[in-house]
A protein has these predicted regions:
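Glycine-rich, positively charged N-terminal anion/phosphate-binding segment
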Residues: 7-19, 34-108
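N-terminal, post-signal-peptide segments of secreted/periplasmic proteins
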Residues: 22-23
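An anion-binding catalytic pocket shared by soluble metabolic enzymes
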Residues: 31
């Protein structure tokens, strides 16, 4: 059985297709952000089928800062999914900054 981490080890034997801010991207397909669909199982399946990069579902900054369990579920990713991009949103720049610094600890 081929696991996602094994697949990524094989892919990374080739040079990256392009870079995003110095992060190597291996492949041509990028999974578009889709709220309500881009959960961890779906992203893992797409990764196994050739997606080179993916996005989490949207997470409201107030929920991140409240430390509720919902954001952790929406931002969960496996190491083999890298690179993965977190999507956060809100209307208060100060809260957006605080939430961004909070999720940065997860090393997306």
């Amino acid at each position: 059985m081929l696991y996602l981490r094994d697949f990524m080890n094989e892919v990374q034997a080739f040079p990256p297709t392009f870079f995003v801010r110095g992060i190597p991207i291996y492949g041509n397909a990028i999974l578009a952000p889709m709220d309500g669909y881009s959960d961890w199982p779906f992203r893992s399946l797409c990764r196994a089928l050739g997606s080179a990069m993916s996005y989490t579902e949207f997470v409201k900054v107030e929920k991140i800062l409240s430390r509720s369990k919902e954001p952790a579920k929406r931002l969960y990713y496996e190491e083999a999914e890298r690179p993965v991009t977190f999507q956060i949103y809100g209307d208060d720049p100060d809260l957006i900054l605080k939430a961004a610094l909070t999720v940065q600890e997860l090393n997306p």
